[in-house]
């Protein structure tokens, strides 16, 4: 599957800033951000590519969560009954701000100017994932991140994939296909 098909499948607005060129096959620089359920840190990496193939990697960075934020996230994950329907907007804003700070730190350390970045994809912090029930809850506010970064943001990948009958991990196969496409078969990913 190509990135353009992924955007369409997930009903992601392909060009939220109106530049008109995010879906072309010219080289684009994308930053991806994820944090695992261990909440040990925020992983940031950058790839440049055409939407079909990766043409250059720009390294990565892991920024640990602050101890109090990590402790609060882990406590919440241990009590799933507190997650469904709960108002977690304050915690979500703190998580979002931490993720934005990680992106800004990464761009600075990698020497990446924000004007070069086409899009930043944020997974958010998963606090409850029950794909059999079609339910997943990530803490992340994409609109807040876009305002803080002033870069187009895509987020909430799991919800659309779950709604389409998936397991809530729509980017992993596309990412692996893009990275492995230049390799000679057979391949094990």
Report the location of each language-model feature:
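Short acidic/glycine-rich loops and adjacent helix/strand connectors
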Residues: 2-189
């Amino acid at each position: 599957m190509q990135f353009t098909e992924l955007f369409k499948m997930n009903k992601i607005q392909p060009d939220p800033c109106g530049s008109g060129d995010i879906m072309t096959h010219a080289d684009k620089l994308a930053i991806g951000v994820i944090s695992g359920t261990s909440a040990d840190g925020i992983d940031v990496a950058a790839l440049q590519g055409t939407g079909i193939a990766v043409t250059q990697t720009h390294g990565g960075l892991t920024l640990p969560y602050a101890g109090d934020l990590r402790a609060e996230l882990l406590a919440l994950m241990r009590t799933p009954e507190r997650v469904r329907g709960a108002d977690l907007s304050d915690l979500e804003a703190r998580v979002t701000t931490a993720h934005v700070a990680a992106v800004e730190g990464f761009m600075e350390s990698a020497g990446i100017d924000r004007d070069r970045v086409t899009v930043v994809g944020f997974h958010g912090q998963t606090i409850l994932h029950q794909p059999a029930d079609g339910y997943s809850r990530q803490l992340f506010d994409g609109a807040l991140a876009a305002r803080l970064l002033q870069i187009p943001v895509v987020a909430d990948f799991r919800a659309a994939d779950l709604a389409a009958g998936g397991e809530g991990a729509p980017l992993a196969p596309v990412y692996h296909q893009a990275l492995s496409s230049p390799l000679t078969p057979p391949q094990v990913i």
